[in-house]
């Protein structure tokens, strides 16, 4: 019994140190399974979308692949005026579109509704507190994890700003936490 407790504690400690956790039941949902299957249709990676949105001077604050009306979409939230401008004086927006074509030509939506403004304001604040860009975070995870990075979101875990990175690997989803 004591040996099991020590073994369990060791496993949890190692998972915490390396920041890798399976996502509890997320990969069991029909939506997640459909998204994982659709990822193979993309001609662009998440890092491609992040880099493209950063070219215009805006700073990417989160990015993900998702299904919009059953179709694959690449979505990147940005802070148009950068990380040093507070949310109330910034332009928080989403660039999204199909990644299935040779060029990713996203539509731009400036957030005005409370849920999107609140979520993107939090992401802006967390990215401003950190030292890493989304590009660096994705690249770091790609070096250590097999599979496809399909989501990166700044979040608060244990009173710290971290990036929650979701990786699709062999039909399963892994959650990797990275320091910002």
Feature-to-residue mapping (PLM):
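Long, terminal "pre-/pro-" and other extracytoplasmic accessory regions
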Residues: 2-8, 19-180
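Hydrophobic core
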Residues: 13-19
């Amino acid at each position: 019994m004591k040996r099991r407790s020590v073994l369990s504690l060791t496993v949890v400690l190692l998972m915490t140190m390396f920041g890798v956790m399976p996502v509890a039941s997320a990969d069991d949902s029909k939506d997640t399974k459909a998204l994982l299957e659709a990822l193979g249709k993309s001609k662009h990676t998440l890092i491609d979308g992040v880099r493209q949105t950063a070219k215009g001077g805006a700073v990417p604050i989160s990015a993900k692949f998702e299904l919009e009306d059953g179709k694959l979409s690449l979505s990147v939230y940005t802070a148009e005026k950068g990380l040093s401008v507070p949310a109330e004086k910034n332009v928080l927006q989403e660039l999204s579109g199909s990644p299935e074509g040779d060029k990713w030509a996203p539509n731009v939506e400036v957030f005005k509704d409370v849920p999107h403004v609140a979520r993107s304001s939090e992401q802006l604040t967390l990215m401003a507190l950190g030292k890493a860009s989304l590009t660096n975070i994705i690249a770091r995870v790609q070096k250590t994890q097999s599979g496809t990075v399909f989501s990166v979101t700044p979040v608060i875990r244990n009173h710290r700003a971290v990036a929650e990175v979701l990786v699709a690997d062999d039909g399963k989803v892994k959650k990797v936490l990275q320091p910002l």
